[in-house]
Amino acid sequence: MALSSIEHYLSYHLRVLLPQVLSSKSSHNIAYIFALFAAITSGFVSLISLYAQPWQEHLSYSSWQINMIVTVINMGMYLTPPILGIIADIHGPITLSLSSVLGFIPSYAYLAYTFHRDHSFTNESDGSFTPTLVCFFIIGVATSGLYFSALITCAKLFPGTKLLSISIPTTCYGLSSLIGSQFLRVKYFHPVDYPYLDLGRVFKAFAWIYTVIGVMIWIATSKVAQIQHEADIMEEQDRMAEPSDNDVENHYDDNEQSRLLHATHAQQMTLMKVFRDPVLYIFGATIFCALGPLEMFIANMGSLTNVLAGGHEPAMSSALLSIYALTSTLTRLGTGLTVDYFNKRQLSVKWILLLFLVVGLVTQGKIYMLSMSSLDHSHMVTINRKLFYIGIMQGIAYGGLFTIYPTITLMVWGEKMFGTAYGTLMIAPALGSALSCLIYADVYDSECANSTTRSCIAPVYETTALEFCAAILLTVVVTVLWRKRRTHI
């Protein structure tokens, strides 16, 4: 497909410049490396779990406000992929990358400015909290846009190998939390006059980082446009070299038009079949119940750690996020390998899904038991060890489920309908995380704000445990319905 006018103008200068300064192979490899850097930085929004303390102490945000921020981020990330996919298909990944950078830079610059203002002017009553929500919604959309742009770029640069096109960029995205949490340990972000993370400096640094990333992904996506443009030229030359006959050509055009109309009608019928499939929505309900609590854990990791550890381990949140991110990334890779093994052995991958759901359920029980335990501050080593194990188990559940759900979607609805089906299903974690985060905020603000006991948070994990039980039950129902349809997973 020829370049759109937007993709043509955005990539024109680099398409002209790259062949003059780099060989084709060098520009190809550099573009891939730049796309991986974009994939790594696209996930920095997950560091929000480290922002709870400065938001609460410096800006006097309540847990409800913090979870509202998390909710709008998830809405931006999960509700827009179908639209972003259409834009990328029509106008290329360069359009997504430019839009993402234009979303990141001013949003983070504004957030840095508001954090450094006097906290007396940052209360919700003066209306400044609403622009903050708008900024984080834009950041959520930009996160999906930059990640999609990087992923599509890698896939187009190395379409022949799943390792380079899918696995490595996906792994880089999973490493965002780990790399970002280590980056925020730099002393620059912890000035002596701040007893907590200076989010003004953090957000300002992010604005500069995304400026650099914007240049890098512009180069990478322009290389993709160059490859497409060269392919279009070769196709045009081949077509002009063929002998022409007006009658044959007209007959061919009529048949081609008829074929395209038939294909369009068939595609519309297939789309309607997907949207009318009740099993799709039951499957979406399992995602709603499972991924909602896991997203909530990431968002509230800082405040949860303070509640469970009594606020005596300020470095625990960062360490917990690091181990969580590492475990999640390794699980994503391991799950992909396990799925390949199961497919070769003709084993059902539903057992992998059920295993991760059980791990998630057990983890909710572990958090509940720790919240109800009688361990005091003299047992901090034991408490920290339990939190460490909880972080590992949550990472396994999160990484595994976020890998197995799209895999099953691809197996059931096929490659042609994958984007439509999975884009629809991605609404579920957005709604699920919104519900779970607001439940957490309500319990935290009403029970834990003035409490010194960790049991105040227990009602949240009674609810999340029930959600995982529902997810397991609905998964069994879905697999039975698929078996009746002779759909094997």
From Swiss-Prot:
Against CDD domains, the record matches this protein to: MFS_Mch1p_like
Glycosylation sites noted in the Swiss-Prot or TrEMBL record: N123, N450
Instruction: Please give the coiled-coil regions recorded for this protein.
Output: none
Where primarily located?
membrane
Q: Where in the cell is it found?
A: Vacuole membrane
Q: Which UniProt keywords apply?
A: Glycoprotein, Membrane, Transmembrane, Transmembrane helix, Transport, Vacuole
Spans traversing the lipid bilayer: 30-50, 68-88, 92-112, 132-152, 163-183, 202-222, 279-299, 307-327, 351-371, 388-408, 421-441, 462-482
Q: Name one GO molecular function term.
A: transmembrane transporter activity
Output the InterPro entries linked to this UniProt entry: MFS, MFS_trans_sf
A Gene Ontology cellular component where this protein is annotated is: fungal-type vacuole membrane
Pfam families given in the database record: MFS_1
For this protein, the record's SUPFAM superfamilies field holds:
MFS general substrate transporter (SSF103473)
Q: What is the membrane topology here?
A: Multi-pass membrane protein
Family assignment from sequence similarity? Belongs to the major facilitator superfamily.
Function per UniProt: Probable transporter.
* Annotated protein name in UniProt: Probable transporter MCH1
What gene is this protein a product of? MCH1
